[in-house]
Structures are given as C-alpha cells and as structure tokens.
Regions:
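A structural signal for multi-pass alpha-helical bundles of membrane permease subunits
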Residues: 16-282
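Short, Lys/Arg-rich, polar N-terminal cytosolic tail immediately upstream
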Residues: 1-12
Length: 282
C-alpha cells in the first residue's frame, strides 16, 4: 500500500509541475495589462506600446501639483463615501427587519428587490434625471449620492439579510431575558456578529460608487466642479484630441489606489471580525 502511494505521488509530480507552470504563465499573461500603466507612468514619452521607458516622475508631479485632479479625487470621495454611508444605514435596518420579522409577501418583496438589479442603468437614467430635476437635486452631491445609493441598495439588502440570518435568534432572546431591549440586543449582540456583512457591503458599495461613470455624468452635467475622478479620467483621455498616455497612466493608477486600499483594509477587518464572532458564538 505504501509502495502504491509512493508510485501515485511520483506520477502526480510531473502533472502538478505542468499545472503550476501553466498557472504561472496564465498569471503573467493576466498581469501584462497592469504592466503597461506602471511603465507608462514613469515614461517621459509614453506611447500605446510597451518599450524601454525614459524614466521620469514628471507625470506624477503633474497630477499631484494640479488642483484640478485633487478636486476630482475629493469629489469621488464625497460621492462614494456618502453613498456607502447611506447604503450601510438603509441595508442594515432593512436587512435586520427582513431577517427577524415575517410578514405576508416577504419572499415576493425580496425577489422584487433583486429583480431591480436586472434593469440596466441606461434604462432608468432619463426618468431619474427628470425626477431629480423636479426635486432640484440635479448638479448637487446629494442627488448623485441618493441615486447611486438607490442603485446599490438591492444587493446590499440581500447581503445584510444573509449575514443577519447567520446570527442565531436564540442569542437575542437570551439577551432580552437579561434585560436588553430589541434595539440594545441588535446593537450589542447582532451587529458585532454580523460585522463581516458590514465590511463586504461597504466594500462592494464603495467600489461601485467610486467607479460609477454614467450617473454623475448625467446628473452633474451642469456642475463640472463637482465631477468625480471617473469623468476626469475620461476627459483626460480625449482632451484636445491628443492622448497624453503618461498622464493617463498616472491617473489610472491613482484612480485604483482607494479601492485596492479599502479591499486590503476590509480584508483584515473581516478576518478579525470573523474570529471575534466565532469566539462570541462559543
């Protein structure tokens, strides 16, 4: 039996080596698109094709020193951060209610909420613009934040409900016996155990809001000083009918940093929250 196991491992050795080599080559192929902006960002004469770069930090200096790009980044943080806060608050309340209370038509309501995710944004942007125009919300941060939050709320509601479902109701009932109110048990018992759901929802919402292009393009068409980074990146691509590839590469790198940083931050937080929730459950 030991001999057969050794022979099987010996046969699997070359196959495993080939599999790792294939995965390594595939990973390198997938990383090539990320190599271009890194090289073009430090190239004084960057072009569309990769070549030995003429090393310079002029493109980074241009972005950092120009107040226009700092304003674009600030606008993106205001819009994405505001939408994330609104979605977290609404989805936490709605997800808890859908998880803990039964009412007629709950399943129909949940699937109806999910169905709205199938409607493309291009089909709703015109009526959305008309509604926000009637409410005097066009060309305002509030209008864009509410619009993006409404688009992201269905998925967030499903996520939060799923995480609340993983928290046993018996823990809440035990806290009621100890004198806590429903609100108190939701804050002190349920919320810490459902913390991974908050992190996942915040991550998805922020990334979607940060990368949203169509909604701010239409709703902020009359206020260029409030446009986010996504629109600024597009305008840098078509400015003067001449593409500054080095500047575009730097903007693309800067544009991705917040989402990547938030991912790693939330990833560590999720690990800690999951361990804490497991210990509390014991």
């Amino acid at each position: 039996m030991l001999a057969s196991s050794a022979a099987r491992r010996q046969r699997q050795g070359p196959a495993r080596l080939y599999a790792y080599a294939f995965l390594l080559a595939l990973s390198g192929f997938c990383l090539v698109p990320f190599l271009w902006p890194l090289l073009a960002s430090v190239d004084g004469h960057a072009g569309l094709f990769l070549r030995a770069p003429d090393l310079t930090l002029h493109n980074f200096h241009k972005v950092v020193s120009d107040p226009t790009y700092r304003r674009l980044a600030l606008n993106s943080f205001i819009i994405a951060g505001g939408a994330t806060i609104v979605v977290l608050a609404a989805s936490a309340l709605g997800g808890y209610a859908l998880s803990r209370f039964s009412f007629p038509g709950r399943r129909v309501f949940m699937f109806g909420v999910l169905f709205t995710r199938m409607i493309p944004a291009t089909a709703t942007i015109v009526p959305l613009y008309i509604i926000e125009g009637d409410l005097s919300l066009t060309d305002t941060y509030q209008g864009v934040i509410l619009a993006i939050a409404a688009q992201q709320l269905p998925l967030a509601l499903w996520l939060m409900k799923g995480f609340f479902d993983t928290v046993p109701a018996s823990l809440e009932e035990a806290s009621w016996i100890d004198g806590l109110s429903r609100f108190g048990s939701a804050i002190r018992i349920v919320a810490p155990l459902a913390a991974p759901g908050v992190g996942v929802t915040a991550l998805f919402t922020f990334i979607e809001a940060w990368g949203d292009f169509l909604t701010p393009l239409i709703l902020l068409s009359g206020s260029p000083d409030k446009t986010p980074f996504s629109i600024g990146l597009f305008r840098a691509f078509i400015a003067f009918n001449l593409v500054d590839w080095g500047l575009l590469a730097v903007l693309a790198i800067v544009y991705t940093i917040p989402a990547v940083a938030l991912y790693f931050l939330v990833r560590r937080y999720l690990l800690r929250a999951t361990m804490t929730g497991g210990l509390a459950g014991e």
